[in-house]
Amino acid sequence: MAGVITASEPSWIAPFSGLSPRQFGKLVTVLRREGADAVRKGRPWSLPLEDRALLVAAYWRTNLTMRQLAPLFGVSKSAADRIIDHLGPMLALQPRKRFAKDTVLIVDGTLVPTRDHTIAERSKNYRYSTNHQVVIDADTRLVVVVGRPLAGNRNDCKAWEESGAKAAVGKTLTIADGGYPGTGLVIPHRRERGQAGLPDWKEEHNKSHKQVRARVEHVFARMKTWKILRDCRLKGDGVHHAMLGIARMHNLALTG
């Protein structure tokens, strides 16, 4: 069965991965170095590593069903499933272990509609969703940590710790919105009970805080051009692997 899409034709790479051919080539080189193309027991892969990586990226990018996606790469539905199960986790972003003293981070939670009801719950958007705590570097806009997914009805202030994001950043200065009270994060000033308004300096601080914090919303907007984050059909850890892999490709697209 001959496929239509292949990484050997550079014009297919950007539409189906969100990366330039050069960026995609760097990703494949790192995957090969990390053992993604190692000889394994059982039936050998019917596609080269480049095409397998493009298949996974295309699945996340387009959110086509396996029945739609597999023929485009000339493989069976079950083969496409196996490729995603094997390579998806290997594409995951590795959390940054150390931060410079002057680093400023921004955290926010984003909801991913998720059909696996064993890990998802109805959230404020009335859909079954998972809550993902995403931490970015305020200066570079790169994703540095993605917490483990929690049920979509989990408050951000609880999800911050329960997802592992808090432990991952340690004591690094981190900015958040007003949904993180009592967490020790830098959040906007609030009026106290009976207070008519905030002092001018607090209003000014909140204004600059909001402008900086908007950077994480821009990251979410870019990440959600990978359509699987709008309606994830994957089960179990699949949504986590997709979030981590997309974060890695987002970073690669920014840095080249």
Curated annotation (Swiss-Prot):
Annotated function: Involved in the transposition of the insertion sequence IS112 which inactivates the SalI restriction-modification system.
Keyword DNA-binding applies: yes
Family: Belongs to the transposase 11 family.
Source organism superkingdom: Bacteria
Keywords from the UniProt entry: DNA recombination, DNA-binding, Transposable element, Transposition
Annotated GO MF terms: DNA binding; transposase activity
The name this protein goes by in its record: Putative transposase for insertion sequence element IS112
InterPro entries (UniProt xref): Transposase_11, Transposase_HTH_dom
Residues of the signal peptide: none
Biological process, per Gene Ontology: DNA transposition
